[in-house]
Amino acid sequence: MREILFRGKRIDNGEWVSSGNLITFNDEGEGKQFFIPQMNAKCTCTHDEQDNIISFDSGMFYKVDPETVGQFTGLTDKKGKKAFEDDVIKHHFSDEIGVIRYGEYRNPFGDDIFGGHAGFYVDWVTGENPELLRKDLGYWMKIVEILGNIHDNPELLGGER
């Protein structure tokens, strides 16, 4: 079975946290908020008549910046490091730099005939011909290294995005 993990950067101190759960809470005053619980944390919630959560005890939860939230891909790089959305990877044979993304994508060859794909993929951003590289993440993970992520290390993208 695939390991489900989310990570995000804490708003209070900037530390990265991860857990198997991600909770979104819509606060009328502050808008949508994102929380990642401590591992094995228990939660006490208050519900309204429609069973919507209207409040919860957030003592065991970390409020995280929504822009930094990413899911674990289920894959590791060539050194065994877990790969998450928004990680920056490097292909050492050609020095190509890419970002792990989630969504719909098309590979450069054959997808006009067979259609597109959906899931985790590599958005290649630097190199001689990044648009010619295939994007399916699983193809690359055993031969690339995770260098960082777009939130802590934007300089890794070479000013391209």
PLM features: residue spans?
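Secondary-structure transition motif
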Residues: 1-161
